[in-house]
Amino acid sequence: MNLGRLCRLLKPALLCGALAAPGLAGTMCASRDDWRCARSMHEFSAKDIDGHMVNLDKYRGFVCIVTNVASQUGKTEVNYTQLVDLHARYAECGVRILAFPCNQFGKQEPGSNEKIKEFAAGYNVKFDMFSKICVNGDDAHPLWKWMKIQPKGKGILGNAIKWNFTKFLIDKNGCVVKRYGPMEEPLVIEKDLPHYF
């Protein structure tokens, strides 16, 4: 029996356990591979740029753009500028942007979360910034592991994130509907947004 099927079979029992014994629920399914059981982005959590844990279920009903960011990349200015523009024009329509700093590509995000937050403020960022993470390898954040194996989240020449500013479009149900490579500027996503409002 594969892990995905096992998770689907056990999920109702785990949910009942969580309802009956909330203190125990966090320890019942805490293996490194829990992310494989997820059916949507809404089943994950991540620390925001200030270190507070955020349940991504808060994005249920919103169309989301999830991206890895870096402050010292050659693509930083165009990506931050266009992400800020998209947020300004589409936030009222229900679009949310989730930016995850990452230092795995050319060590182009070396600063602390505090420094990254200051940098983003220089672009007048109003979208959600998260704490620095890894997006590839064993230490990758579970959300990123999950997005990369989704049918519409797979990459070209393998599923690994290739560089800064890889973007995922997530529908209102928390499912990956498209992946955009690092060379694709954020405004490319604009043409796809109306399909998911």
Curated annotation (Swiss-Prot):
Top EC class for this record: oxidoreductase
Residues found modified as Phosphoserine: S40
Keyword NADP carried by entry: no
EC number: 1.11.1.12, 1.11.1.9
Keyword Ribonucleoprotein attached: no
Active site residues per record: U73
GO function terms (MF aspect): glutathione peroxidase activity; phospholipid-hydroperoxide glutathione peroxidase activity
SUPFAM superfamilies (alphabetical): Thioredoxin-like (SSF52833)
UniProt GO BP: arachidonate metabolic process; lipoxygenase pathway; negative regulation of ferroptosis; response to oxidative stress; spermatogenesis
Keyword annotations of the record: Cytoplasm, Developmental protein, Lipid metabolism, Mitochondrion, Oxidoreductase, Peroxidase, Phosphoprotein, Selenocysteine, Transit peptide
Annotated PROSITE patterns: GLUTATHIONE_PEROXID_1, GLUTATHIONE_PEROXID_2, GLUTATHIONE_PEROXID_3
GO CC field: cytosol; mitochondrion; nucleus
Quaternary structure and interacting proteins, as annotated: Monomer. Has a tendency to form higher mass oligomers. Interacts with FUNDC1; this interaction promotes GPX4 recruitment into mitochondria through TOM/TIM complex where it is degraded by mitophagy.
Protein family membership: Belongs to the glutathione peroxidase family.
Functional summary from the UniProt entry: Essential antioxidant peroxidase that directly reduces phospholipid hydroperoxide even if they are incorporated in membranes and lipoproteins. Can also reduce fatty acid hydroperoxide, cholesterol hydroperoxide and thymine hydroperoxide. Plays a key role in protecting cells from oxidative damage by preventing membrane lipid peroxidation. Required to prevent cells from ferroptosis, a non-apoptotic cell death resulting from an iron-dependent accumulation of lipid reactive oxygen species.
Protein name (database record): Phospholipid hydroperoxide glutathione peroxidase
Taxonomic source organism: Macaca fuscata fuscata (Japanese macaque)
Gene: GPX4
